[in-house]
Design a protein with these regions (language model features):
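Protein kinase glycine-rich loop
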Residues: 6-12, 17
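Glycine-rich ATP phosphate-binding loop
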Residues: 16-39
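Structural motif in protein kinase domains
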Residues: 86-96
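Short beta-strand micro-motifs within the conserved protein kinase catalytic domain, predominantly
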Residues: 64-79
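Activation segment signature within eukaryotic-like protein kinase domains
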Residues: 109-110
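Terminal C-lobe "cap" of eukaryotic-type protein kinase domains
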Residues: 248-272
Length: 349
């Protein structure tokens, strides 16, 4: 290999992320990278990410991909994707470790993410899984970080999303139209961005639920009612108006990334800010609330705490033939959920 694998810095549902150091004399790669690896037999999602990143090309607000390679380690053939190293971890790591961001930082990061989404949508792709865990902090110089969009494993060309309906992404970031089985369009990415802004500003999950709250009832409320994530009271009026534009229930009326870039809340802001770093290695589970201690039951090595799994694959096209009510029921377990811990939620892939 042209690089040497270092320590593990994260684990996801389908892959493990490690540090990677270029071998001496290798000038195609930067000295330090992140390598995302999984078994060749389980590499469909990771291959999709590589293909999408290759099609996207170079964008300052998208995590850079340096290519892919195969390796044989421990008697197992691995598929590896070499990526830009995010020295600051994810925005989910920051919120977990330090709480809410000040509004000036929320503005800057929101603008950076919007630039990335505007580019992605302009090229004709939809990310399908925008959330704090997938928004990464990369060094831009010695003292500041910039936010970049990562994890394109669920991303699709917009027209292909329309051809195959079904659930994609994380339930509690899903727009109402996605819960009813409609296509995950660029507008759904904007709804998810709004959820991310709420979490950055409040330091709490976008849907703040008490222990004992019925998950089925909440998801039906998102789908069929007029509910949207609660706007943090500490946000300025501009910030509240920005979120209103993100949370318009009609996807045809919801503002686009291009429109939001001109909103007073983010217009004219810088995209890099000083930030503390967490000393802990992050994980990248695919749970609805992104708690790092949760590992999906779809992970290569499921945890003993995994108590149940879905009856069927939620990405299956068969969902287009089921009713909206049945689709939403598939997002929850038969057990009464405990909203205070992540084990009450399951990943949607």
């Amino acid at each position: 290999m042209t690089w040497v694998r270092g320590g593990t810095i994260g684990r996801g549902s389908f892959a493990t992320v490690s540090l990677a150091v270029s071998r001496a004399g290798e000038d195609r790669f930067p000295p330090l990278m992140a390598v995302k690896s999984c078994g060749v037999e389980d590499s469909a999602t990771l291959r999709n990410e590589t293909q999408v990143l290759s099609r996207l090309g170079d964008c300052q607000e998208v995590l850079r991909c340096y290519g892919d390679e195969y390796s044989c380690e421990g008697g197992r053939e691995l598929y590896n994707v070499l990526l830009e190293y995010a020295a600051g971890g994810s925005l989910a790591d920051y919120v977990r470790d330090f709480g809410a961001l000040v509004e000036s930082d929320v503005k800057r990061y929101a603008r950076s993410i919007l630039r990335g989404l505007d580019y992605i949508h302009g090229v004709g792709f939809v990310h399908c899984d925008v959330k704090l865990q997938n928004l990464l902090l990369c060094s831009s110089n010695d003292s500041v970080f910039c936010a970049k969009i990562g994890d394109f494993g669920l991303a699709k060309k917009a027209e292909k999303v329309a051809e195959k309906k079904g659930f994609r992404g994380t339930p509690m970031y899903m727009a109402p139209e996605c819960l009813s089985g409609e296509e995950h369009s660029a507008a759904a990415d904007i709804w998810a961005l709004g959820c991310a802004v709420v979490e950055m500003a409040s330091g709490k999950p976008a849907w703040q639920c008490q222990p004992g709250t019925d998950a089925n009832a909440l998801l039906f409320r998102i789908w069929g009612g007029k509910a949207s994530p609660e706007t943090p009271s500490e946000l300025s009026e501009e910030g509240k108006d920005f979120l209103e534009k993100c949370f318009l229930r009609d996807p045809r009326k919801r503002w686009t990334a291009e429109m939001l870039l001109d909103h007073p809340f983010v217009a004219g802001t810088d995209v890099t800010v000083p930030l503390k770093q967490s000393d802990e290695a992050s994980t990248s589970p695919r749970s609805p609330f992104d708690f790092p201690e949760w590992a999906s039951d779809h992970a290569p090595s499921p945890t003993p705490d995994s108590e149940a799994c879905f009856d069927r694959d939620l990405n299956s096209s068969s969902h287009s033939r089921t009713s909206p009510a049945d689709r939403i029921r598939q997002l929850v377990t038969d057990q009464t959920p405990n909203w205070s811990v992540s084990e009450s939620w399951f990943a949607v892939r």
